[in-house]
Amino acid sequence: YKDYEEYVSEQTKANKRKLHWEFPGNDHVQWIKTVKLNANKIICHGTRRGGEQKQFKLHYPDAYVIGTEISDTASQFEMTVQHDFAVEKKEWIKNFDILYSNAFDHSYDPDACIETWKNQLAWGGRMFLDWYGLANLDGMQGPRDPVSGSLENFIKFLNNHKIEVLQQNNNFKHGYILMCKNGESNE
């Protein structure tokens, strides 16, 4: 991108083009529920039309669930706010038991983004990140998915940011889910 405005424009165009797509990861949320039984606050980043939030609300009915979407379409969907997921919000720091995203590959600044997300985890919180095999191979990035790399390189990236990968699950139709924790917390 030549600048941040172009990034937002490209992400918004992609969002509007894919707005009719349904969230494909219902089985992902079911698995998350088996490894993280309890959660009071859940945040989902890059949620397009809010399918993630609906699934989390189904499995954690008493939890506060919110999602972020950079596009101006965010206000059309319940439990969704328009927000660039890489931008820190003070009220979200150390606030969430679960952070979920299948959109990390959309990051404008991956280093800033992952630090923001790490800081949103409450004590004992878990970050669940989808990483999609072929779609994330080195050299596969494009204007709508600017971050790519092998799973091995992605895990190295997380470790460099003091994010500990606790579990990997690839028993899904598409990609992997990594369950992570803030490696700087003393839990």
Indicate where each model-derived feature is located.
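Class I SAM-dependent methyltransferase Rossmann-like catalytic core
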Residues: 1-37
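A short SAM/SAH-binding and catalytic strip from SAM-dependent methyltransferases
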Residues: 97-110
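A short glycine-rich, Lys/Arg-flanked "PGG" loop and its adjoining helix->strand segment in the class I
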Residues: 111-126
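Conserved Class I S-adenosyl-L-methionine
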Residues: 134, 138-167
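Core SAM-dependent methyltransferase catalytic element
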Residues: 161-187
